[in-house]
Swiss-Prot record:
There is a cross-link at residues 44-47, 46-49 (Beta-methyllanthionine (Thr-Cys)). Lanthionine-containing peptide antibiotic (lantibiotic) active on Gram-positive bacteria such as staphylococci, enterococci and streptococci. The bactericidal activity of lantibiotics is based on depolarization of energized bacterial cytoplasmic membranes, initiated by the formation of aqueous transmembrane pores. The gene is elkA. It comes from Staphylococcus epidermidis. Disulfide bonds: none annotated. This is Lantibiotic epilancin.
Length: 55
């Protein structure tokens, strides 16, 4: 009985981590996109961002 309760709690913890991870990784992705765009504007000649419309 104790083992099944422990398994249940463990699974709950895993599910919570999964749901927490999604919005967090999405915001990290957005941030890195912003940073790369800003960086691209500074080095248009090197990375060729002028093709995508960066100035």
């Amino acid at each position: 009985m104790n083992n099944s309760l422990f398994d249940l709690n463990l699974n709950k913890g895993v599910e919570t981590q999964k749901s927490d991870l999604s919005p967090q990784s999405a915001s990290v992705l957005k941030t890195s996109i912003k940073v790369s765009k800003k960086y691209c504007k500074g080095v248009t000649l090197t990375c060729g961002c002028n093709i995508t419309g960066g100035k």
